[in-house]
A protein has these predicted regions:
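Loop/turn-rich, solvent-exposed surfaces of beta-rich toroidal or solenoidal domains
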Residues: 254-303
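A short, hydrophobic C-terminal helix/tail in secreted or cell-surface proteins
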Residues: 351-369
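Residue-level detector of Asp-centered blade-edge/turn motifs that repeat once per structural unit
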Residues: 59-63, 110-113, 166-169, 225-228, ...
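Blade-level signature of beta-propeller repeat domains, shared across WD40, Kelch, NHL, RCC1
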Residues: 311-348
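Signature of short aromatic-glycine-proline-rich micro-motifs recurring in repeat-based ectodomains
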Residues: 41-58, 97-109, 153-166, 176, ...
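Beta-propeller fold detector
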Residues: 23-43, 87-96, 142-154, 200-212, ...
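Blade-loop segments of beta-propeller domains
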Residues: 81, 85-113
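Short glycine/acidic-enriched loop and turn motifs that connect beta-strands
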Residues: 72-76, 122-127, 178-185, 238-239, ...
Length: 374
């Protein structure tokens, strides 16, 4: 009797397990730029070029727009329609508010309530160049405010990477630290976390690590919150997953990236599962990983909406962002500097219903067999 029970039990387990399998698609959002790609200079636009002047953009969940920091012809923060890529204008900069830094505007992020945060690039941070973060209450704000300014949080470089988590008084910002030729001594392997009690004014803490890795600059070119006290970063080559408490960082995992030029990243939850989107800054290839086990990211799909010969991105800068998430689908935007902005739709496709029915049928057959066994 034992020999007869085992095959049926194995069959039922196999069918039941198969009911949880799924596939994935990543396809260009054809309404965006006409083919899923807003190429540099497309349609005569000047604010998206090939001169290393566009390094950061963000998705605004309250407007479905993109916010692009461009230094072409002077600083502007362009507002682009998230479905089409059409130019919707620019944020108001006020008068005399945005000043200082190696670049006055570099990277940008948006909180869940629509508040917009733009960081300058300061390298090194010091008396001659404060690290600043500016805040707009929304896209219609008449002027930004200075949400954070420091000349002493680090003697290294800040502003190449930025991520935003939460909203209101629970908003957190993180910026990756790196070393510079004149930035003093120290490991420069951490990141600055900015927090607020009122949603307007921020204080900063430099999170540092004992020993290496992380190595200097390991959070410089890619950085994302996983949750309110965990981040993942990279400069290319390895991801550094870490937890932080106050100023103390703890390295949790160092998984290798799929390529040395895989850098920009963003994390989101879709259908109850965490996913990591990354961008290869050499080829503009977008990769998606299942993060059910954060210590072992599993590549599920990849895609690229660009075409032809791309301009080089020697600085390895850029940004990738999850956009609208609905059910098992999400829009993903990606920009490798000098290579335009892509928009794609990522879909988690559940196992077809008939497989679940087969699993249920297997359980019924097993019950019938048990009932009438001799």
């Amino acid at each position: 009797m034992t020999n007869r029970i085992l095959p049926l039990a194995v069959l039922v387990a196999t069918l039941a397990g198969g009911a949880h399998a799924q596939s994935y698609t990543l396809t260009p959002l054809s309404s965006f730029g006409g083919d899923g790609w807003l190429a540099p200079g497309e349609g005569g636009i000047s604010y998206l070029g090939t001169a290393n002047n566009e390094r950061g953009f963000a998705y605004n969940p309250t407007s479905n727009n993109l916010l692009l920091v461009s230094r072409t012809g002077g600083l502007s923060i362009k507002v682009l329609d998230g479905m089409t890529g059409a130019d919707e204008g620019a944020l108001n900069q006020g008068t005399g508010v945005i000043t200082g830094g190696t670049f006055t505007g570099s990277t940008i992020g948006v909180a869940g309530d629509g508040a917009i945060y733009m960081a300058n690039l300061a390298g090194p941070v010091g008396g001659a160049s404060a690290f600043k973060v500016y805040r707009w209450a929304n896209e219609a704000a008449a002027s930004p405010t200075v949400a954070y300014s420091s000349t002493s949080i680090t003697a290294g470089r800040l502003g190449d990477s930025l991520d935003v988590f939460g909203s209101g008084s629970g908003t957190l910002l993180v910026a990756g630290e790196s070393n510079t030729g004149s930035g003093g001594s120290g490991p420069r392997n951490g990141y600055a976390v900015l927090s607020t009690a009122n949603g307007l004014d921020y204080s900063g803490t430099l999170v540092t690590f004992t020993g290496t890795p992380p190595n200097a600059g390991d959070h410089r070119l890619g950085l994302t919150f996983i949750d309110s006290n965990s981040v993942m970063g990279t400069v290319g080559g390895n991801w550094r997953l870490s937890d932080f408490s106050g100023a103390a960082g703890t390295l949790v995992d160092s998984s290798p990236t799929s390529s040395a030029s895989e850098r920009a990243m963003d994390y989101a939850t879709i259908g109850g599962i965490g996913y990591l989107a990354t961008l290869d800054t050499a080829s503009s290839l977008v990769r998606i990983y299942d993060m059910s086990d954060p210590n072992n990211p599993s590549l599920v799909t990849s895609g690229n909406a660009t075409s032809g010969t791309l301009s080089a991105n020697g600085n390895g800068t850029g940004q990738v962002q999850f956009g609208t998430i609905s059910g098992n689908s999400a829009t993903i935007y990606a920009m490798s500097s000098n290579q335009g902005i892509q928009a794609m739709t990522f879909t988690v496709v559940p196992e077809p219903e008939e497989y679940a029915m087969m699993a249920a049928g297997g359980l019924i057959a097993f019950g019938v067999w048990r009932r009438f066994r001799r």
